[in-house]
């Protein structure tokens, strides 16, 4: 694990930083840092859901983007409850964060 990931692991609130990086266009770095968290296995799915919920609330972006992220987080929660892969689900959330600031209109 890289030193940057260890710093992230020590402070779960840095999920906010990971999400903000995705929104700001640094999807590769955001994804890499999140993958390190998953590989480490430090947090349960419920803890990650809570951290992402808090991060969406605090992230700097338009309300429309936050709404899309909350909807996706609801879907992530549902899929994880049915045995889905946390890595795939949360990375999909990060990619939505990456593209959402550039989308127009309502997500369908």
Describe the function of each predicted region.
Residues 1-13:
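Long, charge-dense, solvent-exposed interaction surfaces that engage phosphate-rich ligands
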Residues 14-18:
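Alpha-helical tetratricopeptide repeat
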Residues 19-108:
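Helix-rich C-terminal "collar"/helical-bundle subdomain used as an assembly and partner-interaction module
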């Amino acid at each position: 694990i890289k030193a940057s990931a260890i710093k992230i692991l020590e402070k779960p609130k840095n999920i906010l930083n990971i999400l903000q990086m995705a929104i700001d266009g640094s999807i590769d770095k955001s994804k890499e840092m999140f993958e390190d968290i998953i590989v480490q296995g430090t947090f349960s799915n419920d803890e990650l859901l809570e951290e992402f919920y808090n991060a969406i609330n605090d992230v700097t972006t338009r309300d429309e983007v936050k709404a899309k992220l909350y909807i996706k987080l609801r879907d992530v929660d549902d899929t994880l409850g049915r045995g889905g892969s946390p890595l795939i689900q949360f990375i999909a959330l990060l990619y939505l964060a990456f593209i959402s600031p550039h989308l127009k209109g309502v997500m369908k």
